[in-house]
């Protein structure tokens, strides 16, 4: 299995280094649910600004303030503790009376707004995230500048970030131990983290191998393609390759790679043979996913950061802004720009 740091680059390995997250204010994330609160219902959506707190900690504190069980507070995604983040929490509080959430106090947190909502906010139920990053101590401004220009056109590999695999790869190691021993895992969180790490690692491997072998945006017979921004896919046939290639070049269609699991992967013929060969050595992880009935799925191989802009504060400091759809990783953008240094080279998002 290829280590995250050794995954193939789309724009070649960066020539310089830089510091990511010298302080929390250098990594700002604003959650975009893609919808507004209903204004009525038994749930309350609460938009929180936080710094130095992880999502679960804040959710538990909110539950305590509202005198409800912790399971009655949900969120769409985890946000990094060592960053400045805006996100929505959802608390089930039936009744007509609206609690005064302006009185909720927690160090490092501030309630920005809240309103009634009809439905529970479920994990993954967000449109995306807006990022504002500051890279400091950049050793090669010209290289970073050119890479930013190239990313606007060609995007970056849509790798799952190193944080998906746990500190020191602990989640992936847990999945491997589980696969090798077949010992039942009762802890639901561990099961989820380990299976997610296994499938993500296999996806990364397929994308890395495709980047090595050929133009990642070159459609081959049997590729599974999806409309940009959509989850469903269809299979490319030889007769359609020229037209499909035009639509891929126009960013109307995205070539996908497998998220391996049980059932058919989605590709056929040449593309399927390539994907199977790319992860042929990882028989234990593949068997684990099938055994645990994790359904195979697809994910776009490339990621195009939207609304990408940047501003050099000086020759060694650059502020970068962009928006990513849910499930994508800002660190997968940063790794195409600089070789990161510091304690926060790999961080949660």
UniProtKB/Swiss-Prot annotation:
Substrate binds at residues 27, 129, 329. Residues 155-303 form the TRUD domain. Keywords: Isomerase, tRNA processing. It comes from the Bacteria. One of its GO terms (molecular function) is tRNA pseudouridine(13) synthase activity. GO terms for cellular component: cytosol. The active site is at residue 80. Coiled coil: none annotated. GO terms for biological process: tRNA pseudouridine synthesis. PROSITE patterns: TRUD, UPF0024. Pfam families: TruD. Signal peptide: none annotated. Its EC number is 5.4.99.27. It catalyses: uridine(13) in tRNA = pseudouridine(13) in tRNA. It is an enzyme of class 5 (isomerase). NCBIfam families: PRK00984.1-4 (NF002155), tRNA_TruD_broad (TIGR00094). Responsible for synthesis of pseudouridine from uracil-13 in transfer RNAs. Belongs to the pseudouridine synthase TruD family. HAMAP family: TruD. This is tRNA pseudouridine synthase D. It comes from Shigella flexneri serotype 5b (strain 8401). The lineage of its organism: Bacteria, Pseudomonadati, Pseudomonadota, Gammaproteobacteria, Enterobacterales. The gene is truD.
